[in-house]
Amino acid sequence: KQAISSTAVDSLDKFIETVAKIYHESNRKVEGIALSCPGVIDAANGTIKVVVAYPYLQGICLTELISKACDNIKVSLENDAKCAGLAEAWIGSAQAYDDAIIVVLGTGIGGAIIKNKQIHHGAHLFAGEISTLIVDYDKETNQVLTWSDIASTTALCKRAAEALAVTSIDGRRVFELANNADEVVLEVLKNFCLDIAIQLYNLQYSYDPGVICIGGGISK
């Protein structure tokens, strides 16, 4: 198990080179490579349709390129939140249910719809892309406010910083203050949780899954 800084990988060639290096330096028999990536993923064709974090990967048949660089080994590709959903359905909190919704709170909000214990991608691959659910709309400015804008961990830190009148604050510090009964942070956290609960309510009534699982860095 190892980690590589995403900032050190800034091009398609570097990305392929990095994965190939890990593969070729492995001292184990590798039967396949599974890639978990942000963005709208066409898992069947091994392509990232939409990705903001790594624009150089957009529209590329990533599985084919990596396979060629790694002795033609089998390579699979899926959205990171949907990978979390598969894990929950397989050996996690959703394993006792046929249908589930997985919500991953992080830099944005990831999601996965589990239908009959399988990932449901939808007709246009947007099923589970709950980060972009609209929570408010300003007609005068034509500005849209999404669920990610108000209920991601990034949004929580921003809301806490504004309430505390500081330039910035990280999530760990937010919860340290909350655990120490800081009234300002507790109020921020209360409203943050309410914003999450409202959309979970909407998701429940939209799909009626057996369970909704919440994960991501915030769950630590």
Where are the language model's segments positioned?
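Structural signature of FAD isoalloxazine-binding scaffolds in flavoprotein oxidoreductases
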Residues: 126-130
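A charged helix-plus-loop insertion that forms the helical arch/lid used to bind
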Residues: 47-59
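ATP-binding/phosphotransfer module of carbohydrate and carboxylate kinases, centering on a glycine-rich
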Residues: 1-32, 42-47, 63-75, 87-99, ...
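Short beta-strand-to-turn element immediately C-terminal to the catalytic PLP-Schiff-base lysine
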Residues: 87-88, 112-116, 120-122, 134-136
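A cytosolic small-molecule/anion-sensing beta-strand core signal
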Residues: 31, 37, 115-116
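Short loop/edge segments at beta-strand edges and connector loops
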Residues: 77-81
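Residue-level structural signal for beta-strand termini and adjacent loop
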Residues: 3-5, 54, 125
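Gly/Thr-rich phosphate-binding beta-strand-loop-beta motif of the actin/hexokinase/Hsp70
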Residues: 1, 102-119
